[in-house]
Structure formats: C-alpha cells, structure tokens
UniProtKB/Swiss-Prot annotation:
It is an enzyme of class 2 (transferase). It comes from Psychromonas ingrahamii (strain DSM 17664 / CCUG 51855 / 37). The keyword Disulfide bond does not apply. It comes from the Bacteria. The chain crosses the membrane at residues 27-47, 71-91, 98-118, 142-162, 168-188, 199-219, 236-256, 263-283, 288-308, 338-358. InterPro entries: Glycosyl_transferase_4, PNAcMuramoyl-5peptid_Trfase, PNAcMuramoyl-5peptid_Trfase_CS. Its EC number is 2.7.8.13. Catalyzes the initial step of the lipid cycle reactions in the biosynthesis of the cell wall peptidoglycan: transfers peptidoglycan precursor phospho-MurNAc-pentapeptide from UDP-MurNAc-pentapeptide onto the lipid carrier undecaprenyl phosphate, yielding undecaprenyl-pyrophosphoryl-MurNAc-pentapeptide, known as lipid I. It is a multi-pass membrane protein. This is Phospho-N-acetylmuramoyl-pentapeptide-transferase. Keywords: Cell cycle, Cell division, Cell inner membrane, Cell membrane, Cell shape, Cell wall biogenesis/degradation, Magnesium, Membrane, Metal-binding, Peptidoglycan synthesis, Transferase, Transmembrane, Transmembrane helix. It catalyses: UDP-N-acetyl-alpha-D-muramoyl-L-alanyl-gamma-D-glutamyl-meso-2,6-diaminopimeloyl-D-alanyl-D-alanine + di-trans,octa-cis-undecaprenyl phosphate = di-trans,octa-cis-undecaprenyl diphospho-N-acetyl-alpha-D-muramoyl-L-alanyl-D-glutamyl-meso-2,6-diaminopimeloyl-D-alanyl-D-alanine + UMP. It holds the Pfam family Glycos_transf_4. It is found in: Cell inner membrane.
Length: 360
C-alpha cells in the first residue's frame, strides 16, 4: 500500500521515492510489526485474562509447568495481526507471492484457532480431532501446491536445490506438489511441537526468518543467484519484506512470551508460523535449508516419532518425556537453560545453513 502511494505521489514529492526501496521497506516492516505487537500485546493479554482463555497444563508434565496453568494463550493472534498488517502496509501487493504467503499463514492460523478455541473456550480436552486437523492442513497445503505448480512461469520455480552441489538442480515436475505438501505440513507441525516452553519456538522462528530474508534477497537478484548457483526468482524480492514482518512480530511477541511468560501463542500461532516458514522455503526453493536451519524443529519432531514408535513396538520409552525439551526438564535442567541452549543451537544451525550457499 505504501509503495503504491509513494509511486503515485513521487512526481510531486520526490523524497517519497525512498519508501519504494526494498531495504527501507524491510526495516519499516520490522519496526511496524514490532510496534504493533508492543502496542496491542497488553490489550490482548487483558482480554484473554478477562475471558479466562488460559493454558491447560498436562498433569503428567514437569512439575515446574503447573504454575503455568491459566496463563493467557492464543497469543498467536497478536503475531498474525502484526504480520498481516505490516505486510499489507509495506509489501508490493501486485506480487503474487505476498498473497500466497498470507493465504497460507491465515489458513493454518484458522486451523490452530479452532483447535485452541475448542480446547480452551469449549473445554474439549483434545481440541480439534487430530484427523480433522490433518485433513484441513492437507487440503490447504495441496491447494497451495497446485496453485504454485500451475502459476509457475519459469523452470527455476519448480527445481530442487541440493546444498553443496553447483549444477544439481533437477526439474521436479509433478513431484513438486508432494514436496510442497510435506514441507508446509511438516514445518507447521514441527513448530507446533516445539512450542512447549517460554520463548522456545518464537526465537528460532525469528532467526530462521531473518536468514530467509537474506536468501530471498539473493534469490531475487540475477547476479547473486548465478554467482551462488541458486535459482533466480525475481518475485522472491517481496519475501524479504514478509520475513521482516516475522522478525518484528516475533520479537514483539517475545517481549511478553519470555520466561516467565505472560502469554502463550497457542496453536493459532505455532501452526501458522510453521506453515509460513515452510511456504517461504518452498518459494525460494530451499527446502533442505529449512531442515538445516530449523534443525531444532526437526529434532523435536523426531523425538516424538521415536518415543511413540518405541513405546508401541517395545513398550519402552526412549526419552523421559517427549518432545525432547521436556526430557531435559525431567532431567532437572531449569527451563531458561533449555530455552537458551536451544537458541544457541539454532544460531549455529542458521550459520551453517547460510554457509552452504557458498560452499558448493
């Protein structure tokens, strides 16, 4: 919206041209989303407290979590509001990627909202039944995959990129559709599983989004893309702004979500943010980098799969509790130690992921 106004008025006010620069819009997107979160955060927390929309704590969980019962949840509404508002304000709305990203984010957010609503407001212990949750996730992801496949204008948009290989970028064809499906649904549920401690999910999300901002910038510039042997996708430029909104909204939410948390994001936030990272990875053709940089999300998911599989087959548990962050709590680690160490691991993984762009 701002870009349109700036271009409309630039003939009379030339200084407005600065608002069309990608770098300026990205910084402003970060600051706008941050300000939105900080301004509306306290208001949302009071609203959630007033209507007793609070966290339900597992009785078999770590004892330190019992004090979290009743803490306002569904705070992901704040994150989605900040991302949507800032994106509509600072991104170029004639870029189809902007609308694809917002559709995916809000659709998965709606699924998470329904799950939270049933659990917290309607007091259904299991929330949205698992098969229905996966059904709607699958429908959304498949619609997204088909739209991206049919709207692709260059072969680069349907290639598969392998880190460490210069020339190995095979054309996927119809295989692109299941890749999109598993990336988006998998990422959504992985972030959801990680969101179990104060600030544990949001900060790695911010870090990965910041890295994807750089990757999207490089992908959208022909010289950088050719130099790094990555697909050249001009439309990816606006994903830099979108990633900026994630950083701003995430930091603003962390202000209230840091230990001890005043609010939790709930499924409305975690499912949406995971899907958002997934669709960005798909659009810049870097699904493998998402696995590397989001390694914490991957490990959390694998810990649940291994725990469930081991118990079903051997009647024995591998971890004291899954996801794995609860395992370390059960071992006696204080919650802040688990959180910060997982953050440190994410920083290392993000740096490794960025290095792979050059090491080929």
């Amino acid at each position: 919206m701002i870009v349109w106004l700036a271009e409309l008025l630039s003939s009379q006010f030339t200084f407005l041209n600065v608002l069309t620069y990608l770098s300026v819009r990205t910084v402003m997107a970060v600051l706008t989303a941050l300000a939105f979160s900080l301004f509306f955060g306290p208001k949302l927390i009071r609203f959630l407290q007033k209507f007793q929309i609070g966290q339900i704590v597992r009785q078999d969980g770590p004892e330190s979590h019992f004090s979290k019962a009743g803490t306002p949840t569904m705070g992901g509404i704040l994150i989605l509001g900040a991302i949507t508002f800032s994106s509509l304000l600072w991104a170029r709305l004639d870029n189809s990627y902007v609308w694809i990203v917002l559709f995916t984010t809000l659709a998965f957010g709606a699924i998470g909202f329904m799950d939270d609503y049933l659990k917290v407001v309607r007091k259904h212990p299991d929330g949205l039944i698992a098969r229905w949750k996966y059904f709607w996730q699958s429908v959304t992801a498949l619609v997204l995959a088909v739209v991206l496949f049919l709207s692709a204008t260059t072969p680069a948009e349907l290639t598969f990129v392998m880190p460490f290989f210069k020339q190995y970028m095979p054309y996927l064809g119809l295989a692109f559709i299941p890749l999109v499906y598993f990336t988006v649904v998998g990422s959504s549920n992985a972030v959801n599983l990680t969101d179990g401690l104060d600030g544990l999910a949001i900060m790695p999300t911010v870090m990965v989004a910041a890295a994807f901002a750089l990757i999207a910038y490089l992908t959208s510039h022909v010289n950088y893309a050719h130099y790094l042997y990555i697909p050249y996708i001009p439309k990816a430029s606006e994903l830099v702004v979108i990633c900026g909104t994630i950083v701003g909204a995430g930091l603003g939410f962390l202000w209230f979500n840091t230990y001890p948390a005043q609010v939790f994001m709930g499924d409305v936030g975690s499912l949406a943010l995971g899907a958002l990272l997934g669709v960005i990875a798909v659009l810049v053709r870097q699904e493998i980098l998402l696995v590397i940089m989001g390694g914490i999300f991957v490990v959390e998911t694998l810990s649940v799969i291994l725990q469930v599989g081991s118990y079903k087959m051997r009647k024995r548990r591998i971890f004291r509790m899954a996801p794995i962050h609860h395992h370390y709590e059960k071992k006696g680690w204080p919650e802040p130690r688990v959180i910060v160490r997982f953050w440190i691991i994410t920083i290392v993984l993000v740096l490794i992921g960025l290095v792979t762009l050059k090491v080929r």
